[in-house]
Every structure is written in C-alpha cells, then in structure tokens.
UniProtKB/Swiss-Prot annotation:
Protein's name according to its UniProt entry: Methionyl-tRNA formyltransferase
Name of the coding gene: fmt
Root EC class: transferase
Superkingdom of the organism of origin: Bacteria
Transmembrane segments: none
Native source species: Chloroflexus aurantiacus (strain ATCC 29366 / DSM 635 / J-10-fl)
Metal-binding recorded as keyword: no
Amino acid sequence: MRILFLGSPSFAVHALEALVAAGHEIVGVVTQPDRPAGRDRRLTPPPVKIAAMAHNLPVLQPETLRDPTVVETLSALQPEVGVVAAYGEILRRAVLSIPPLGYLNIHPSLLPLYRGPTPVAGAILAGETVTGVTIMLLDPSMDSGPILAQAVVDLPPTARAGQLTDELFRIGADLLVQVLPRYARGEIEPRPQDHSRATVTKMLKKEDGRIDWSLPAIVIERMTRAYDPWPGAYTFWRGQPLRIIKAAVASADGTNVPGTVIGRSGSGHPLVQTGSDALELIEVQPASRRPMSGSAWLAGVHADNIRLGE
C-alpha cells in the first residue's frame, strides 16, 4: 500500500521499520524539524528521520502541517492511507482528508482511557495493573476516533515510563501491520469509543516532577517511574536539585515532618518521611553528578537532621 508515515521519536521507529519490512510503499515520511539537543545544543535530527534516510525514503520536516503549501505537497504524494506514531501535532481536516482510507494511529493506552500526550505516565501514576495499545482511526479531536484493534499488556509495579512506552510501540507496530491490510479490505469494522469512559492526560512540565513530601509514599514512588526519563522526580537539598531515580515504600509511624530523613533501611539507604509511610531512596542523582545509591549519597552528605525539599 502507498503509505504516508508521520512520527518523530525513537519509539515511532518501530512502526516505520515494521511497515518497510512488510513491503509497503512509503511515499513520504513526515517528522519534526531538526532541533538543538545536548549540552552543546547541536542541531539533531529526529530518530524517525535517521531511520527513513537509512531506507532512502523521502523525508519532509515542516514546522507545521497547517501551512497550505505543506498540505498540497502531502496531497501530491497520493497516499492510500496514513500512519501516525507520536508525530507531535494534531492533524487538521485538510490533512486528514488526503488519504482515502484515513490515518491509522498507534496510541499507547487502552482507549478511551488515557487520551492525550502522556498516557503511559498517567497509567503508572494511577497504579494501573494493566495497560495496552490501541490502533485507531484519527478524527479532528484528540484520540477520540474509532478503534480498529487493541492489545492488553501487563503493567508491573516496577514499570518505568520510558521503557514501557518503547515496549508498547513495539507491540503496536506488530499489531499495525496485522490490522492494516484487513482494514483496507474492509474486514474490520471500526468501533466507536465510549466517550463517557474517557480520561485525558496532560502535557508534562518540568515542575510536575517536583516532589511534595506531604503526599503518600506510594504516590511519590510512582512519580519516580512515571516521570522517567523526563521530567524526572526531584527534590532539593541545600538549594540544589536531587533527582530520585529509584525508590520503595517503607513503613513509618508518620510522626515526623514530611521530607525528613528518619533513618536508614536495611540496605543503608535513607528513609524519608512522607504524608503516609516513608520512602526508601534506593538510587539518586545530585546536580551535576552521576547517579549513585542512596546510601552513597547519604554517606557523602555529612549532616544530621536532613530535611529534603529545601
């Protein structure tokens, strides 16, 4: 099939590679423009662009799809169908109307749950035990189009957002190449979503990762996994940020001020009082330092009466 592919980050590469391996004709790959990245702010191409160039596929990097000249360029490619995997912009009607079969989208949740930009983080924060991936048809609204197929995936209590997102897009890529030909032949009836069950996630900001020690330990522990790799769950010590990479819930009587280091675990890691129970800091990263064990950080602090968040 003649496919127009839209995607940008590393986990979107799984879908592009799967489509190429399945023998589809990729008439164009639309991805975000090169952006400055790293400490030296060097202009860096999106991972999807790198993958597309490796297969000698035509690449387009418009600043926005709202530009009428961009719409004309995409239309001239004459795709039969579009595939979207974390492109980074909601498609407007002018773009949606280009392929006769519309656009299939990979969304890493069991829609209508966790619509929006951060479904994996949302599921982890909520303490879900299962999640999944949905192949859906795009419409002008956000993640509200009819469903073609879903796969249910276990969400273990140690899952981290970055790794889980990659896994879900791998599963989604396999599901996509199974669904696409059947959909094109009319063998799959799109199923409308139950909008009454919909939940919506938000775009994350850096400050979302700042720890409020008055929250229960279980909530903060989930933050360390939901906000990995960005924005990270962090606090402050002596005015400098301290990222909490890995943590565990520990029992505590709750008589201490939240944020206070109340002792050590059996492994020597600091135990921090929270609004309910304590949080064992297993792995942390001080500002401008490499990640280290919580016990190593505590040994290097050389202070009594430690209170985090200040």
